[in-house]
Regions:
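Conserved short histidine dyad/triad with adjacent acidic residue
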Residues: 28-33, 46-62, 100
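Short, conserved beta-strand element in jelly-roll/cupin
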Residues: 47-51, 61-79, 118-121
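A generic structural signal for short beta-strands and their flanking turns/coil linkers
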Residues: 30, 41-46, 65-67, 74, ...
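Ligand-binding loop in jelly-roll beta-barrel domains
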Residues: 97-125
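Short beta-strand segments
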Residues: 57, 85, 126-128
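Short hydrophobic/aromatic patches on the structural cores and recognition surfaces of FHA
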Residues: 74, 90, 105
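A short, N-terminal "cap"/entry segment at the start of jelly-roll beta-barrel domains
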Residues: 1-42, 128-169
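Short acidic-glycine-tyrosine-enriched beta hairpin
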Residues: 82-98
Length: 169
């Protein structure tokens, strides 16, 4: 039998990485970068585990990168422009580029959730906007901040998992 090609990867062999934004101590749900491990350069494919009380990222919108989130296991709440929408295994949320729709995914349940997250990989033309975290702008090169994001009204939800309310940023 020939050796297994490098473009076939096992999720268990790809290490998890838990991102922490500058100016914060909150670890986002850990991610396995499957697409990068398999050699993909234009499409990002990530397996993200959201333990109870975590979220996928800070709420954000992107100017020139499409993104999707598919729930493999468990239940999450999609934070969309300040409103929560329940999602369960088998549900998909898709974010076309340039709409200004801000989003993140929150696990307020009592068990892990598993998400398949995919989209474009770091396009040079892409800009990003964090509606609830404007101080993020100082951590990014000016050229990466989305200045002319389409205006969208935000709902009342603060974007935090229930377990994080009242904790240090």
């Amino acid at each position: 039998m020939p050796d297994r090609p490098a473009f076939i990867v096992s999720a268990a062999s790809v290490p998890e990485d838990a991102h922490v934004y500058p100016q914060s101590t909150e670890a986002m749900g850990p991610t396995r970068s499957l697409g990068a491990a398999a050699g993909l350069q234009r499409i990002g494919i990530n397996l993200q585990r959201l333990p109870p009380g975590t979220r996928s990222s800070w709420p954000h919108a992107e100017s020139d990168e499409e993104e999707f989130v598919y729930v493999i296991e468990g239940e999450v709440q999609a934070w969309i422009d300040g409103h929560l929408h329940p999602m369960k295994a088998g549900d998909l949320a898709a974010f076309p580029a340039g709409t200004g729709v801000s989003h993140c995914f929150i696990n307020n349940s009592e068990r892990d959730a598993l998400l398949l997250v995919g989209g474009d990989v770091a396009r040079p033309s892409n800009r990003i906007f964090y509606p609830l975290n404007p101080t993020r702008r100082q951590d990014l090169p000016e050229a990466l901040w989305w200045h002319d994001v389409p205006p969208r009204a935000l709902g009342p939800h603060d974007g935090l998992p229930d377990a994080r309310r009242g904790m240090a940023p």
